[in-house]
């Protein structure tokens, strides 16, 4: 009987390993409305300034002092501004790295100056979980995670410090699951909703910024 233990153990391990599944897929990334559309107007040189979290989210006495939401928002904004095809977006975050590479190459940098600085603020951000049940939960119950974000973008003239144009964008993202008679999907806390709703709000703000340019409400200079 003792000789059977190693065999049974090996079979058990193989059976458990056979239950493990692995899968992957690519997900299409949403882009601004003007992405890959024709444009013959002025592409004003702009840089992205500070993007701060002005909401109450992660700004309490127990926060670590690192503006993770603002840093994430700035990265998203740079990407959407560039993909809009309406601006010449200048990088000011990796200045030392760019200077190092130019030095290694033996070339002198010829930095381009920005006519405008785009600053941003997360003015509203929040998450909540709402639930419902049918016939006291006997016929089913559900849970929905909801994330909401609102951002403001200000375009500042670098020569005069005048705020020449302002736009806002807001978005809401939700994740739902429902269980009926003990059967159904269950979903834990999804931290990716923060990034998704932030991307949605900033994308809407950039769409509004592009609309302002194309409608003539803001006429950027080159």
Please report, for each region that a protein language model flagged, where it lies by residue.
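Bacterial N-terminal signal peptides that target proteins for export
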Residues: 1-8
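Surface-exposed short loop/turn segments
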Residues: 21-25, 97-164, 174-177, 183-188
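Soluble periplasmic/extracytoplasmic beta-strand elements of cell-envelope proteins
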Residues: 45-52, 76-80, 88-90, 115-123, ...
